[in-house]
């Protein structure tokens, strides 16, 4: 069976409180609109007031997300001419995708160097997961080549699958795992590269109030010598006729995210029958799971966790780790669920033998999940 262990986080260079980030967004959107109108920011105060009211209505509040990490210093000031990405005195959205991709590539290469110091042993298989930038050869491939690991280490990519990509990554790891081998999964999500201050719609304001940068690595193997998760089952479904609810498209300026307000309702109406089908594959009854399992839910936003908690009748304790990660880090796309896993694995209050149900959601609309058990060292 597949086990997961050795979770390691690298925090982004910078961090801002949610209140600071929301204030920055107001100023950025105002500057973008002023550029489009050929005016100065102070000349469009009615726009600024209207935008502030919209954000007050739809943005994720500081009591839900306390802070967010970002690799760009841009979010720490409003001197637009000194920005790396958001040069809003030159255009309404900042630099183009080519420039953002170069920043992504540099940051990912640096992350791999941090995850794998010179003394690190090579994994048998390295899976790179991201939906926020694609450069070939990837940072993982470059590192493997530079270290001379190319004859032993296979490199695979799980790209553009959105917030649910950790589950397909586990499926890939499970399929390639050898009895004696190990598979490393590395998530590098740089969501802060893809804010567009020229898009003032409500769904854009919602997403811009949620997403953050995140980096995490973990190991999959047949057995391990530390506390770990043992995987029982993986399950993935597409919700019928829901493909318009979530889009992640590549534009000339960056990656454009579109989220429908119907997503929480779509998930709420689909999650119980989905969970029944996944439980049947695992050997556990749905009744046992609902009463005893902890739920590692990808916190795409507070409403996602709340709606699932309500529909399934879960206690606060069963979803507490998901809410905590959202509050501490924001939505880091595919890196978020592994952060929840790490929090559960290292929580001494979660005893050995605890069942963990994971749920994540991506474009499609896709529901991905797993059932695991927290266990003591083995093998």
Which positions does each model-derived feature cover?
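Solvent-exposed alpha-helices and their adjacent loops that cap or buttress functional pockets
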Residues: 148-151, 176-179, 203, 208-212, ...
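Claisen-condensing/thiolase-fold acyl-transfer catalytic domains that form or cleave C-C bonds
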Residues: 131-132, 150-152, 157-178, 268, ...
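Membrane-interfacial loop- and helix-cap regions that link adjacent transmembrane helices
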Residues: 245-247, 251-252, 258, 276-294, ...
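Condensing-enzyme catalytic core mediating Claisen C-C bond formation in acyl metabolism
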Residues: 1-99, 196-269, 273-277, 361, ...
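Active-site-adjacent elements of ketosynthase-type condensing enzymes
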Residues: 135-141, 185-206, 235-251, 302-310, ...
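Short beta-strand segments
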Residues: 6, 129, 159, 184-189, ...
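Conserved beta-ketoacyl condensing-enzyme motif
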Residues: 50-147, 285-305
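Active-site glycine-rich loop that binds ribose-phosphate moieties when present
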Residues: 152-153, 158, 166-172, 190-214
């Amino acid at each position: 069976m597949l086990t997961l262990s050795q979770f390691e986080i690298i925090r982004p260079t910078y961090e801002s409180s949610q209140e600071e980030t929301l204030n920055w967004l107001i100023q950025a959107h105002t500057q973008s609109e002023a550029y489009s109108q050929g005016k100065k920011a102070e000349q469009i105060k009615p726009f600024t007031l209207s935008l502030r009211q919209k954000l007050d209505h739809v943005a994720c509040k500081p009591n839900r997300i306390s802070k967010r990490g970002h690799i760009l210093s841009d979010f720490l000031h409003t001197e637009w001419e000194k920005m790396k990405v958001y040069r809003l005195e030159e255009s309404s959205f900042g630099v183009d995708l080519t420039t953002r991709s170069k920043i992504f590539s540099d940051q990912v290469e640096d992350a791999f160097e941090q995850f794998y110091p010179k003394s690190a042993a090579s994994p048998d298989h390295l899976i790179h997961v991201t939906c926020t930038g694609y450069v070939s050869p990837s940072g993982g491939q470059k590192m493997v080549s530079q270290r001379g690991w190319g004859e032993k280490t296979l490199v695979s990519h799980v790209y553009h699958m959105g917030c649910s990509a950790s589950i397909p990554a586990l499926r890939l790891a499970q399929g390639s795992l050898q009895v004696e081998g190990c598979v490393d999964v590395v998530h590098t999500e740089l969501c802060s590269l893809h804010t567009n201050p020229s898009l003032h719609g409500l769904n854009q304001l919602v997403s811009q109030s949620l997403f953050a940068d995140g980096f995490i690595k973990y190991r999959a193997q047949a057995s391990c010598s530390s506390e770990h998760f043992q995987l029982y089952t993986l399950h993935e479904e597409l919700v019928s006729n829901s493909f318009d609810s979530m889009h992640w498209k590549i534009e000339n300026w960056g990656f454009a995210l579109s989220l429908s307000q119907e997503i929480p309702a779509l998930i709420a109406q689909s999650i119980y029958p989905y969970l029944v089908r996944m439980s049947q594959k695992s050997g556990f009854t749905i009744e046992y799971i609902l009463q005893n399992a902890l739920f590692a839910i990808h916190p795409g936003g507070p409403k996602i966790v709340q709606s699932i908690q309500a529909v399934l009748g879960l206690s606060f304790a069963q979803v507490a780790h998901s809410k905590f990660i959202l509050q501490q880090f924001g939505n880091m796309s595919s890196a978020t669920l592994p952060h929840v896993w790490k929090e559960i694995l290292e929580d001494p209050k979660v005893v050995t033998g605890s069942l963990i149900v994971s749920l994540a959601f991506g474009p499609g609309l896709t529901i991905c999940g797993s059932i695991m058990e927290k266990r003591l060292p083995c093998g």
